[in-house]
Each structure stands twice: as structure tokens, then as C-alpha cells.
């Protein structure tokens, strides 16, 4: 089973407007309201592909209940941990080709809740083969909280994928508890190394071979329309992808993570895993809905992706 963790979920609300006017009333004719969070995008895509997946994380208040109800309608298994605080809203105003976001700070997790959640995870880990950790940490959690989860998972023989950035990722990288997979994009890779990394193959090889990445089995770097670059143990790969009509790229990284998790749980070859991961990401970008793929198009896209050992 694949377990996805979304520790700072949200109710995502989008308001499309022809024009956004300040200091006056703006009326919208339609509203989109969904259960949001990077891990939930991963969950939905895995479920659509037919994988055995369960979603967990922190939920609280009326908005937390709304997320639970939304997930129930999709028949996805869930095992969220209830907190005293209120799950947050994230509002996007879509106007004139631009996007203005209003992000609530979200709940503060109490110390007791953070410790009880680890016990909650240990129960879930009994049936877990791959654990996916996605997104930011909510307030109240130590910046090394992901490090604790990776350690607990590794003790149970579970493969781990960490898709985060900033200090929460850095804390894991400087620890002795390394995840199986990380998936930075080129900008996040540059931030981690404190220098600008380009798409040049030699530069990428040198970048992912830095000591900070020691003992991480898979490093998969997204290169946007140029595909991806990957290091698996001592092998390096360049992934070339076909041109597609991009409808909505939001959630493509999460869909790529879903493909990685699927590849790991089925023990697929390096080539198969990388092709599946990139196919999932592309299929998401071809759809309007975030965290959604058209599985009927999977084989067509999969066959067009090229993986070259470099």
C-alpha cells in the first residue's frame, strides 16, 4: 500500500474574474472549491491509476470535515488525525491571465498532537510499502519533523519519497535519515546548493553528486518542458519528453511523485519508473483539473518518452 501524508492541507477556492477591481465589490459567476494539498493531488492520481493508496495528515474544524467529505465522494481511503486547530483556506483569484493568492496561515499543531500523530503513523506503517511526504509543515511542528517520519518509516522497511522544499527538506538532507527519493526542480536544487544550476548535463551530474545528497537512492530533478534528469545510485539519466498542449501545469509535480510511488511499489526498472513518473506529470498538465490524469492516454504518452543513460 502507498501512504500519502499531507500535513498542511487546505480547502482550495478559486474565483475566476474577467477583471479584478480593488477597493470595490467583485462578483463571481462560478467558484471552484476542492480539498487541496500536494499530498492529496498525489493521492487522487494514484487512485485514478488503480493503486492501493490511503491519505493521512492533520485535519481540524469545519474545513477539515469538508476535506474528509470531499475525499469520501471519491471513495479514496483516508486516515486523517484530528487536531484542535482549524484547517486553512487557500484562495486564488484568477484575473486577466494572472493569479493572486491569499493563503491563510493554518493551524498550530500542539506538541501532544505532533507526538500522537507519530503513534498514529506507526499503526498505518504496518500495511505501508511506500510513504509519500508532500508539502510544507504546519506551524507548531519542528523543522526536523519530516526527519522523524523518515526514520520511523525506514525502521519499518518502508520506502520514502519526500517532496518538500526549504528548511524542512534541508533538515532531512543534513541528517542521517535519508529518504529513498527526493524530487527537486532546478530552482530548488540551486537553492539547496547555494549556486545557480543550469540544465547542462555535466553541471547536473556534479550538482546531484554533492555530499549533501549522499545515501539518497533516487534524485529526480524536474526540468520543465525539457523533461528531467535523474540519479539512481551511481547511474545518471536524461529524460526527454514530447511536446504537448499544456492546459494547466499546476499539480504536475505532484502527479510526477505519484508516478514515482507507483514505480517503486511495482519494483519497475529505472527506465519504466522514469517514463511513468514523467507521463503522469504530463497527463496532469493536459487537463484543466489539478491532480487529475486521463489514464486512457497513458500508453500513448508513455511510449513517446525517452530515457537515456548519460
Curated annotation (Swiss-Prot):
Disulfide bonds: none annotated. GO terms for biological process: D-tagatose 6-phosphate catabolic process; lactose catabolic process via tagatose-6-phosphate. It catalyses: D-tagatofuranose 6-phosphate + ATP = D-tagatofuranose 1,6-bisphosphate + ADP + H(+). SUPFAM superfamilies: Ribokinase-like. InterPro entries: Carboh/pur_kinase_PfkB_CS (IPR002173), LacC (IPR005926), PfkB_dom (IPR011611), Ribokinase-like (IPR029056), Tagatose/fructose_Pkinase (IPR017583). Pathway: Carbohydrate metabolism; D-tagatose 6-phosphate degradation; D-glyceraldehyde 3-phosphate and glycerone phosphate from D-tagatose 6-phosphate: step 1/2. Keywords: ATP-binding, Kinase, Lactose metabolism, Nucleotide-binding, Transferase. It comes from the Bacteria. Its EC number is 2.7.1.144. Pfam families: PfkB. The keyword Nucleotide-binding applies. GO terms for molecular function: ATP binding; phosphofructokinase activity; tagatose-6-phosphate kinase activity. One of its GO terms (cellular component) is cytosol. PROSITE patterns: PFKB_KINASES_1, PFKB_KINASES_2. Belongs to the carbohydrate kinase PfkB family. LacC subfamily. This is Tagatose-6-phosphate kinase.
Amino acid at each position: 500500500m502507498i501512504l500519502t501524508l499531507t500535513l498542511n492541507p487546505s480547502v482550495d477556492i478559486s474565483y475566476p474574474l474577467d477583471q479584478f477591481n480593488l477597493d470595490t465589490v467583485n462578483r463571481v459567476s462560478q467558484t471552484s472549491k476542492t480539498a487541496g494539498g500536494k499530498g492529496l493531488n498525489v493521492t487522487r492520481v494514484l487512485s485514478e491509476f488503480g493503486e492501493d493508496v490511503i491519505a493521512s495528515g492533520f485535519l481540524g474544524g469545519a474545513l477539515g470535515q469538508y476535506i474528509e467529505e470531499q475525499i469520501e465522494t471519491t471513495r479514496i481511503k483516508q486516515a486523517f488525525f484530528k487536531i484542535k486547530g482549524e484547517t486553512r483556506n487557500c484562495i486564488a483569484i484568477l484575473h486577466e491571465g494572472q493569479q493572486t493568492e491569499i493563503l491563510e496561515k493554518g493551524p498550530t499543531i500542539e506538541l501532544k498532537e505532533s507526538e500522537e500523530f507519530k503513534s498514529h503513523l506507526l499503526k498505518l506503517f504496518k500495511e505501508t510499502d511506500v510513504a509519500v511526504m508532500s508539502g510544507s509543515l504546519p506551524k507548531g511542528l519542528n523543522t526536523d519533523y519530516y526527519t522523524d517520519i523518515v526514520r520511523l518509516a525506514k525502521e519499518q522497511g518502508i520506502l520514502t519519497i519526500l517532496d518538500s522544499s526549504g528548511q524542512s527538506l534541508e533538515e532531512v538532507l543534513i541528517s542521517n535519515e535519508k529518504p529513498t527519493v527526493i524530487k527537486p526542480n532546478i530552482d530548488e536544487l540551486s537553492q539547496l546548493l547555494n549556486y545557480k544550476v543550469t540544465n547542462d548535463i555535466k553541471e547536473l551530474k556534479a550538482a546531484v553528486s554533492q555530499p549533501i545528497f549522499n545515501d539518497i537512492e533516487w534524485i529526480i530533478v524536474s526540468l520543465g518542458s525539457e523533461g528531467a534528469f535523474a540519479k539512481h545510485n551511481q547511474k545518471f539519466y536524461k529524460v526527454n519528453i514530447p511536446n504537448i498542449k499544456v492546459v494547466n501545469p499546476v499539480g504536475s509535480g505532484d502527479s510526477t511523485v505519484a508516478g514515482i510511488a507507483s514505480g517503486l511499489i511495482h519494483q519497475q526498472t529505472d527506465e519504466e519508473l522514469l517514463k511513468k513518473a514523467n507521463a503522469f506529470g504530463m497527463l496532469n498538465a493536459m487537463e484543466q483539473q489539478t491532480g487529475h490524469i486521463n489514464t486512457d492516454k497513458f500508453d500513448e504518452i508513455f511510449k513517446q518518452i525517452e530515457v537515456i543513460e548519460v
